[in-house]
A protein has these predicted regions:
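Active-site-adjacent betaalpha module
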Residues: 1-10, 44-52, 74-207
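A short alpha/beta connector and helix-capping loop motif
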Residues: 7, 25-49, 53-56
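Acidic-leg catalytic submotif of subtilisin-like serine proteases
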Residues: 10-20
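Short glycine-rich anion-binding loops that position phosphate/pyrophosphate groups of nucleotides
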Residues: 19, 62, 146-148
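Catalytic P-loop NTPase motifs of RecA-like helicase/translocase cores
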Residues: 20-21, 175
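Surface-exposed, active-site-proximal loop segments in enzymatic domains
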Residues: 23-30, 71-72, 158
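Short beta-strand segments at enzyme active-site cores
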Residues: 54-61, 67, 168
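A basic- and aromatic-enriched beta-loop-alpha substructure that forms the phosphate/nucleotide-
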Residues: 61-79
Length: 207
């Protein structure tokens, strides 16, 4: 059975902000009926990790202006395509917009926050790796949105950086649909790390 040391483990919550998870303001929303249950499961996970002295780092997508988003050719094309899940992406998480706010139930004053994520990568052009190394991490527990893109990308990159990767299976979801969400979990299990539910994570941490 997998064993995790809380002294060298860090939770990374990716894009768990209102821009995905608050149907009232979300610009790239998870289906509304999935938001509440996911937030509840993620809140239970993060609270349990904090109780076990595991640091929590939030990574938040944030853009200065729409031009930063439109610099990506696929995203620019998807913005006006009604058949794309990412339609309207040029309005997503502009600096100062309510979408950039971390979901209140998931944030604690003790948590650390990395802002300014610009693409699917949580590592590219951010100080996430620096922060993880400073915290003494050899293991990351990944939670967040979307399983199919940003979480998957973080799992690949963390693996390439030789972190042990655990995917918090109860605290990830995708606006790309259930089939793609489950496919991403299977891919990560096959090649990148350990998808575990909340209780299995707590057991691996020794409690």
């Amino acid at each position: 059975m997998l064993r995790l040391d809380p002294r060298t483990t860090v939770a990374v919550a990716i894009d768990m902000h209102r821009g995905h998870l608050d149907p009232a303001v979300a610009t790239l929303p998870l289906p509304a009926e999935r938001c509440g249950p996911l937030i509840k499961r993620a809140a239970a996970l993060l609270a349990g990790l904090r109780e076990r002295a595991v640091p929590v780092v939030h990574v938040v997508t944030e853009y200065r202006d729409a031009a930063e988003i439109a610099a990506n050719p696929f995203w620019k094309a998807a913005h006006d395509d009604p058949g794309k899940a990412r339609r309207g992406i040029l309005r997503h998480n502009l600096r100062g917009s309510p979408g950039t706010e971390i979901i209140a139930e998931l944030h604690d004053p003790r948590d650390l926050v990395v802002r300014g994520k610009k693409r699917y990568s949580s590592f590219h052009a951010t100080d996430l790796e620096f922060l993880l190394r400073r915290l003494g991490a050899d293991t990351v527990i990944l939670a967040g949105i979307n399983t199919t893109t940003c979480v998957l990308c973080a799992a690949f990159e963390a693996t390439n950086l030789d972190f042990r990767v655990v995917i918090a299976a109860d605290a990830v979801d995708s606006m790309d649909g259930e089939d793609m969400h489950r496919f991403a979990l299977r891919l990560m299990q096959a090649a990148l790390g350990w998808p575990l539910g909340n209780e299995d994570i707590f057991q691996a941490l020794g409690a």
